[in-house]
Regions:
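Acidic catalytic/metal-coordinating carboxylates
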Residues: 14, 35-38, 61-67
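Conserved acidic carboxylate
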Residues: 10
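Active-site residues of response regulator receiver
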Residues: 54, 84
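Charged docking surfaces used in two-component/phosphorelay signaling
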Residues: 17-25
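C-terminal output helix
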Residues: 108-117
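The feature encodes the CheY-like receiver
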Residues: 58, 88, 107
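Short hydrophobic/Thr-rich beta-strand motif most characteristic of the beta2 strand and flanking loop
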Residues: 27-34, 42, 104
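Short amphipathic alpha-helix used as the core "switch/output" element in two-component signaling
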Residues: 41, 63-76
Length: 124
């Protein structure tokens, strides 16, 4: 059985490194994209098992990227965890309306992120 693939769409290198370090001790394969446009293209290319989507992204926002992914057959049902550092009241609902399966506010503990990933994508 091949490793399950997670696409992480995040423009901040430090945040990407934190997730890289977290997932290198798991059975998941991590693929990265650095902006919303690249994230949509990469998701359609590789068809990941789960997507971690930052909301504040260059080119197109994470919200718009999620809308585009939900409109595409190959990614319409892929779990998407929206991650944001600008958590305001109602943002979680807006993210879910845009296509997020779950929502996580920064700063978050790596344990909380891994727990959420495993909820939608068990390692076994």
């Amino acid at each position: 059985m091949s490793a399950k693939t997670i696409l992480y769409v995040e423009d901040n290198e430090m945040n990407r490194q934190i997730v890289r370090d977290l997932l290198k001790r798991t059975k998941y394969q991590l693929v990265e994209a650095h902006d919303g446009e690249a994230g949509v293209a990469k998701a359609l290319e590789i068809r990941p098992d789960l997507i971690l989507m930052d909301i504040q992204l260059p080119k197109i926002s994470g919200m718009e990227a999620m809308r585009q992914l939900r409109a595409q057959g190959p990614t319409a049902a892929t779990p998407i965890i929206a991650i944001t550092s600008f958590a305001l009241s109602g943002d979680d609902q807006k993210a879910k309306e845009a296509g997020a399966t779950a929502y996580l506010s920064k700063p978050y503990s790596p344990f909380d992120l891994l727990k959420l990933i495993r909820q939608y994508l068990p390692e076994s």
